[in-house]
Amino acid sequence: LSLDGSKELNSILQASPDIYYFSFAPTTTVKRSNSHFHDPISETPILLRIRSKLIGSRIAYLDDGKKTDSLWFENDGIVNTISMYGPTTGYNGPDPILEFEEAELLIPGQWYWMKIPEMDHYSIIGHLGNHERIKRAEEYLIQHAIRLKGLPAE
């Protein structure tokens, strides 16, 4: 989905006040010590390394002339990590978005994101990734399923 397509979609859709929203935000890059660019870590699958390096150093432009900044460089090899937190564009402005904290009270209608370090796009979906990372991704997903099961049913 393009940046402009995301903005258009976010203008149509709104968070429901009765639904809990969660987002995983994997990253397989590290910020360079001498610049604001990001490079893939050594465990990033070979098929994602070049794309990860490109995303980690390119600015994107919207149709209205606005552009992304270095916050958009961190990525999972396919998607920039900042896009995974939740909807921030659209005519209605950003949805409420918070980093998930295990001990905090969860509020419906709000987005909660969870950073997953050293995790690439392939591994989090269980396809073509590193076996160790896929196993770790499974553990995240099982833990999240348990979390979801514990949410109040209305």
Regions inferred by a protein language model and the residue ranges of each:
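Lipid deacylating catalytic domains
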Residues: 1-154
